[in-house]
Amino acid sequence: LLLWAWTMAGKSVIQLKRPDLEGYFDFVHNPPTPWIGTSVQDRFKIIGGESRQNELWRPFAGKIAKENRKQAIVEGTDIEVLRDGHTLSHEAMKICYSAVSCYYDYLTDEGYAFGNPIPAIRKQSPYLIKGATQKNIKRLSDLQWDYVLECAQSAADADPLHERTLFVTATLKSLYLRVSELSDRSNWQPTWKHYWRDSDGNHWLKVLGKGNKMRDVSVPSALLPFIERYRLYRASLSPSFGINSALVAKNRGTGGMTSRQLRRIVQDAFDLAYEKMRSEGFDGEASALREATTHWLRHTGASQDIATRPLKHMADDLGHASMGTTDQVYIQSDMKERARSGKTREV
């Protein structure tokens, strides 16, 4: 807001009137290309002990589809052209209105402004549309998942270095994990002691999820061979391997892996599956797989299991605060009931 007010409106934020702010939200919803970057960048960088402006920083970061980014690299196209037509999503606009409203509340409380015009502007906003819409969960199809798992297994059979690829891919999908929950962080380092068995013989994995909330995720029997396979591989590499060793370790160096490193591992499995699907004639499914991200594994596992497990159990394993969240994301029972009853209507 400050940057726009100074450079575009030529005013201080305390001089902005309602028409000015409405123009600002129009601007934010569809910003000009020079204001949009192709990746998230820090505004300042520490160079030689001094804070310097980062020339790559832009106020907005366009979300470039993975397939478009890869295609641009293959064709040698400037990825900058892919920013055209960028608009903020409904959720992003909601956050924008809320942030600016809080800012004007502060200015009012401190005596810089004479009131907060944002609530009135938000009421008339064309960018905030009320109403429920059915969410499309981004997940792998059953065929895509079969290829991903099969290719990861084949790679591990051919080269032990891919044992980690197989373990990470199978674990993220089967336990509905966010990639951060398997990564090494400043406040949490997943180790083999977090994989444990209770007195009834049930297996669990302790993870630190969103909001620094600890939970135990139930481990299905089908995943146990993959865990044991990776454990034996790790034990063969080092005599010091034990319960305090990192759950997912680097091939070189010590310690666990970052989220970025784990995403690269999963991408290896996706790339192998993509090539095999194309070679076997599944061009459409292969093309869709190029859009897949690591988080799709979480959605894939949950979507496959939601019909056969109690909602409460799914919510607990997913780390959702309420069953309502799980229902809204994966079941959407209200939408399905409405669709079922609506099918019998006459023309």
Question: Model segments located where?
Answer:
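DNA breakage-rejoining catalytic core of tyrosine-based enzymes
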Residues: 128-150, 212-222, 238-243
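DNA/chromatin major-groove-contacting recognition/catalytic segments
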Residues: 316, 328-347
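Short, basic (Lys/Arg/His-rich) helix/loop patches that form interaction surfaces
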Residues: 263-316, 323
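C-terminal catalytic core of Y-nucleophile DNA break-rejoin enzymes
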Residues: 209-229, 243-269
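Short pre-functional
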Residues: 101-105, 163-184, 205, 304
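N-terminal core-binding DNA-recognition domain of tyrosine recombinases/integrases
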Residues: 1-135, 155-156
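Conserved tyrosine-mediated DNA breakage-rejoining catalytic core shared by Y-recombinases
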Residues: 184-229, 235
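Basic, Lys/Arg- and aromatic-enriched nucleic-acid-binding interface segment
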Residues: 87-90, 147-179
